Protein backbone atom coordinates (compact mmCIF):
# COMPACT_ATOMS: atom_id res chain seq x y z
CA UNK A 1 0.00 0.00 0.00
CA UNK A 2 2.87 2.37 0.79
CA UNK A 3 4.38 1.72 -2.64
CA UNK A 4 1.10 2.52 -4.37
CA UNK A 5 0.70 5.74 -2.39
CA UNK A 6 4.32 6.62 -3.18
CA UNK A 7 3.76 6.10 -6.91
CA UNK A 8 0.54 8.14 -6.86
CA UNK A 9 2.28 10.93 -4.94
CA UNK A 10 5.19 10.88 -7.41
CA UNK A 11 2.82 11.11 -10.40
CA UNK A 12 0.94 14.01 -8.80
CA UNK A 13 4.20 15.83 -8.13
CA UNK A 14 5.43 15.25 -11.70
CA UNK A 15 2.16 16.56 -13.16
CA UNK A 16 2.37 19.59 -10.87
CA UNK A 17 5.89 20.40 -12.08
CA UNK A 18 4.95 20.10 -15.74
CA UNK A 19 1.78 22.15 -15.29
CA UNK A 20 3.58 24.99 -13.51
CA UNK A 21 6.07 25.71 -16.29
CA UNK A 22 5.85 29.25 -17.62
CA UNK A 23 5.51 28.44 -21.31
CA UNK A 24 4.20 31.91 -22.19
CA UNK A 25 6.49 34.00 -20.04
CA UNK A 26 6.02 37.14 -22.16
CA UNK A 27 2.20 36.92 -22.08
CA UNK A 28 2.14 36.81 -25.87
CA UNK A 29 -1.03 36.46 -27.92
CA UNK A 30 -0.94 35.78 -31.65
CA UNK A 31 -3.67 36.94 -34.04
CA UNK A 32 -3.92 35.88 -37.68
CA UNK A 33 -5.66 36.92 -40.90
CA UNK A 34 -8.95 35.55 -39.59
CA UNK A 35 -8.97 38.39 -37.06
CA UNK A 36 -8.93 40.97 -39.90
CA UNK A 37 -6.58 43.28 -37.98
CA UNK A 38 -4.31 44.67 -40.71
CA UNK A 39 -5.78 46.95 -43.36
CA UNK A 40 -5.91 45.97 -47.03
CA UNK A 41 -3.88 49.07 -47.88
CA UNK A 42 -1.14 48.11 -45.44
CA UNK A 43 -0.97 44.59 -46.88
CA UNK A 44 -1.00 45.93 -50.47
CA UNK A 45 1.81 48.40 -49.70
CA UNK A 46 3.91 45.67 -48.05
CA UNK A 47 3.67 42.95 -50.68
CA UNK A 48 5.08 39.47 -50.23
CA UNK A 49 6.73 37.50 -53.04
CA UNK A 50 4.55 34.94 -54.91
CA UNK A 51 1.26 36.54 -53.83
CA UNK A 52 -1.28 38.13 -56.20
CA UNK A 53 -2.99 41.30 -54.97
CA UNK A 54 -6.17 42.88 -56.35
CA UNK A 55 -5.62 46.39 -57.72
CA UNK A 56 -7.84 49.17 -56.35
CA UNK A 57 -9.15 52.31 -58.02
CA UNK A 58 -8.81 55.67 -56.26
CA UNK A 59 -12.40 55.36 -54.99
CA UNK A 60 -11.55 52.07 -53.23
CA UNK A 61 -13.28 49.72 -55.69
CA UNK A 62 -11.31 46.96 -57.38
CA UNK A 63 -10.18 47.33 -60.99
CA UNK A 64 -11.49 44.86 -63.56
CA UNK A 65 -10.19 43.96 -67.00
CA UNK A 66 -12.25 43.90 -70.21
CA UNK A 67 -13.55 40.40 -69.35
CA UNK A 68 -14.80 41.46 -65.92
CA UNK A 69 -12.03 39.70 -64.01
CA UNK A 70 -10.28 41.49 -61.18
CA UNK A 71 -6.90 42.94 -62.11
CA UNK A 72 -4.10 41.58 -60.00
CA UNK A 73 -0.47 42.43 -59.50
CA UNK A 74 2.35 40.18 -58.31
CA UNK A 75 5.64 41.63 -57.09
CA UNK A 76 8.33 38.99 -57.62
CA UNK A 77 10.97 41.41 -56.33
CA UNK A 78 9.22 41.67 -52.95
CA UNK A 79 10.73 39.86 -49.97
CA UNK A 80 9.37 36.47 -48.91
CA UNK A 81 8.51 37.89 -45.50
CA UNK A 82 8.41 41.23 -43.70
CA UNK A 83 8.67 41.93 -39.99
CA UNK A 84 7.51 45.04 -38.16
CA UNK A 85 8.26 45.95 -34.55
CA UNK A 86 5.63 48.43 -33.40
CA UNK A 87 6.36 50.51 -30.31
CA UNK A 88 3.75 53.30 -30.48
CA UNK A 89 0.11 54.03 -31.33
CA UNK A 90 1.02 56.35 -34.21
CA UNK A 91 2.71 53.54 -36.12
CA UNK A 92 0.03 51.03 -35.14
CA UNK A 93 -2.78 53.26 -36.44
CA UNK A 94 -1.25 53.20 -39.95
CA UNK A 95 -1.43 49.40 -39.98
CA UNK A 96 -4.65 48.24 -38.32
CA UNK A 97 -8.37 48.49 -38.87
CA UNK A 98 -9.76 50.77 -36.17
CA UNK A 99 -11.05 49.19 -32.96
CA UNK A 100 -9.65 45.74 -33.83
CA UNK A 101 -6.96 45.70 -31.13
CA UNK A 102 -6.07 47.68 -28.04
CA UNK A 103 -2.43 47.90 -27.02
CA UNK A 104 -1.00 49.58 -23.92
CA UNK A 105 2.43 50.63 -25.19
CA UNK A 106 3.54 51.46 -21.64
CA UNK A 107 3.62 47.72 -20.91
CA UNK A 108 3.23 46.01 -24.31
CA UNK A 109 4.82 45.82 -27.74
CA UNK A 110 3.54 44.52 -31.09
CA UNK A 111 5.52 42.35 -33.50
CA UNK A 112 4.03 41.62 -36.93
CA UNK A 113 5.35 39.10 -39.44
CA UNK A 114 3.93 38.97 -42.99
CA UNK A 115 4.67 35.79 -44.92
CA UNK A 116 3.57 33.64 -47.89
CA UNK A 117 1.43 30.56 -47.27
CA UNK A 118 -0.93 28.03 -48.85
CA UNK A 119 -2.80 27.53 -45.56
CA UNK A 120 -5.18 29.61 -43.44
CA UNK A 121 -4.92 27.65 -40.21
CA UNK A 122 -4.79 29.32 -36.81
CA UNK A 123 -1.29 29.99 -35.50
CA UNK A 124 0.10 29.18 -32.05
CA UNK A 125 3.27 30.26 -30.28
CA UNK A 126 5.63 27.41 -29.50
CA UNK A 127 8.36 29.56 -27.93
CA UNK A 128 9.85 33.02 -27.75
CA UNK A 129 13.53 33.49 -27.03
CA UNK A 130 14.88 36.96 -26.30
CA UNK A 131 18.51 37.94 -25.99
CA UNK A 132 20.42 41.18 -26.65
CA UNK A 133 17.54 42.86 -28.50
CA UNK A 134 16.84 39.82 -30.71
CA UNK A 135 13.56 37.95 -30.41
CA UNK A 136 13.16 34.51 -31.98
CA UNK A 137 9.58 33.35 -32.42
CA UNK A 138 8.70 29.72 -33.10
CA UNK A 139 5.17 29.51 -34.47
CA UNK A 140 3.16 26.45 -35.44
CA UNK A 141 -0.18 25.56 -36.93
CA UNK A 142 -2.14 22.33 -36.55
CA UNK A 143 -3.40 20.00 -39.24
CA UNK A 144 -5.22 16.69 -39.16
CA UNK A 145 -3.64 13.73 -40.88
CA UNK A 146 -5.15 13.28 -44.34
CA UNK A 147 -7.09 16.56 -44.12
CA UNK A 148 -6.62 18.59 -47.28
CA UNK A 149 -6.94 22.28 -46.45
CA UNK A 150 -4.54 24.10 -48.76
CA UNK A 151 -5.61 27.09 -50.81
CA UNK A 152 -4.15 29.42 -53.38
CA UNK A 153 -1.02 31.33 -52.40
CA UNK A 154 -1.75 34.28 -50.17
CA UNK A 155 -0.14 36.64 -47.69
CA UNK A 156 -0.58 35.69 -44.05
CA UNK A 157 0.44 37.41 -40.90
CA UNK A 158 1.25 36.70 -37.29
CA UNK A 159 0.24 39.76 -35.25
CA UNK A 160 1.68 39.35 -31.75
CA UNK A 161 0.91 41.49 -28.72
CA UNK A 162 3.26 40.77 -25.83
CA UNK A 163 5.02 42.19 -22.79
CA UNK A 164 7.20 45.17 -23.62
CA UNK A 165 10.78 44.19 -24.42
CA UNK A 166 13.53 46.19 -26.09
CA UNK A 167 13.23 44.26 -29.36
CA UNK A 168 15.42 45.54 -32.18
CA UNK A 169 15.19 42.52 -34.46
CA UNK A 170 12.73 39.64 -34.70
CA UNK A 171 12.97 36.36 -36.60
CA UNK A 172 10.23 33.81 -37.17
CA UNK A 173 10.20 30.10 -37.91
CA UNK A 174 7.03 28.21 -38.80
CA UNK A 175 6.18 24.51 -38.49
CA UNK A 176 3.09 22.33 -38.68
CA UNK A 177 2.03 19.90 -35.97
CA UNK A 178 -0.05 16.96 -37.02
CA UNK A 179 -2.94 16.12 -34.70
CA UNK A 180 -5.35 13.20 -34.75
Regions found by a protein language model. Give the residues of each.
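Exposed, flexible binding/inhibitory loops of compact, secreted disulfide-stabilized domains
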Residues: 20-180
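Sec-dependent N-terminal signal peptides of Gram-positive bacterial secreted proteins and lipoproteins
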Residues: 1-24
Amino acid sequence: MKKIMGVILFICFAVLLVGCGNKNKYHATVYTNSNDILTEDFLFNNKIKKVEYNVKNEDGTYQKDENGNYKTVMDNDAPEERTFIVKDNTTLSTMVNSNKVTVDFETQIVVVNLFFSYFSRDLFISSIKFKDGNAKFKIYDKTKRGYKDSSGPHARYAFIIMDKLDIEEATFSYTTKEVW
